[in-house]
Amino acid sequence: MTGYITKGIGGFYYVKTSEGIVECKPRGIFRKQKITPVAGDVVTLETENGAAVIAAIAPRRNVFVRPPMANLDVLFLVASTTQPTPSILLLAKLSAIAVDKGVQPVIVCTKCDLAEAEFLRSAYEKSTLPFIRIDYATGEGLDDIRHWINGRLCAFCGNSGVGKSTLLNALLPDVERQTAAISQKLGRGRHTTREVTIFEAFGGRIADTPGFASLEASRAAFIPKEGLEHAFPEFGDRKSTRLNSSHVSISYAVFCLKKKKKKQQTKKENPFRISSVALDRL
């Protein structure tokens, strides 16, 4: 019997199969091999002494250590233009990690009016990154997110205060209730639980990742310079005609330094100006 892990806690894993959710434990061989099953893993179950056990883990397309999950298809990078203002560097970092791991990043703009959203959109208009503006009053953007979820495993990522919980509640009003019920059963508060939980919705799956604002592939992983131009689609087609990998890494490093040095001077200015100018000069 096969299925995928929806949640793991306290050494137990909950696997969604054609027969429903099965509680199980992994075989000891995984501990010897230093392999830890995570949410999103496709696994094979067998029965030992009347109990289900994880006998095999299918090859992973990708795996992340924070939050612990595997086989992610889409990463929604949630940002707001007000309270807090967006960090272009954080969006660049997260999108680069996602692209390098074969995950499609999608920029989602919340808590913003049309004029402010256009500044953020302009920073990515020459890239291949999809951009979705959310308006809860009209429902704008919610159908676009549902479209991306269909047939895929998705997760939401972003700084505290950008509206991830509000967005999830707008998409899935029952998620908070389901998660609260699980936390109550385990005797834990909603925000002290940091386990990934996968829900099925809109023909796909959504990973609820409480307590995680960032994304980490591996503490030992890095993107080689040969892969930088592919990890930063913001550079557009120009990367193949005017830039090689070294130029990309140097240009981006210079951009980061300028951003850091001018942080104080630009607090009252348009927060997207440096990014737009830097991209135009490449």
Outline where the language-model segments fall.
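Structural detector for short beta-strands of small beta-barrel domains
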Residues: M1-I9
